[in-house]
Curated annotation (Swiss-Prot):
TFIIA is a heterodimer of the large unprocessed subunit 1 and a small subunit gamma. Keywords: Nucleus, Transcription, Transcription regulation. Pfam families: TFIIA_gamma_C, TFIIA_gamma_N. This is Transcription initiation factor IIA subunit 2. InterPro entries: TFIIA_a-hlx (IPR009083), TFIIA_b-brl (IPR009088), TFIIA_gsu (IPR003194), TFIIA_gsu_C (IPR015871), TFIIA_gsu_N (IPR015872). GO terms for cellular component: transcription factor TFIIA complex. It is found in: Nucleus. CDD domains: TFIIA_gamma_C (cd10014), TFIIA_gamma_N (cd10145). Its main location: nucleus.
Length: 104
């Protein structure tokens, strides 16, 4: 199974990348090992979010654009109302990215 690299741009992903770069610069990590660590990060973060996150949100707004590239859906919505169990928030624009997950 392939995992998407979208979580590498999160705070956790960028911090990990910076730590790996520093370790490479000080010869504390073998060349190429950083790629293996990042691939494992992609796998672990995807699995953890799929299994452990149970919170739900409701979104209502106007769909501006949508696209599917490399099995990742991107939805851009305007004037969005976001609801969870305790609060309601309204924002001007939301961009959602989600990998397409198919189980056979």
């Amino acid at each position: 199974m392939t995992y998407h690299e979208m979580y590498r741009s999160t705070t956790l992903g960028t911090t990990l990348r910076e730590a790996l770069d520093e370790m490479l610069a000080h010869n504390l990590l073998q060349p190429g090992m950083d790629h293996k660590v990042m691939q494992k990060f992609d796998q672990c973060i995807s699995n953890a979010l799929a299994k452990r996150v149970k919170n739900r949100l409701s979104l209502r707004g106007h769909l501006n654009t949508y696209r599917n590239c490399d099995n990742v859906w991107t939805l851009v919505m305007n004037d969005v109302e976001i609801k969870d169990s305790s609060a309601i928030m309204t924002v001007d624009k939301v961009s959602l990215n989600s990998p397409l997950i198919c189980k056979i």
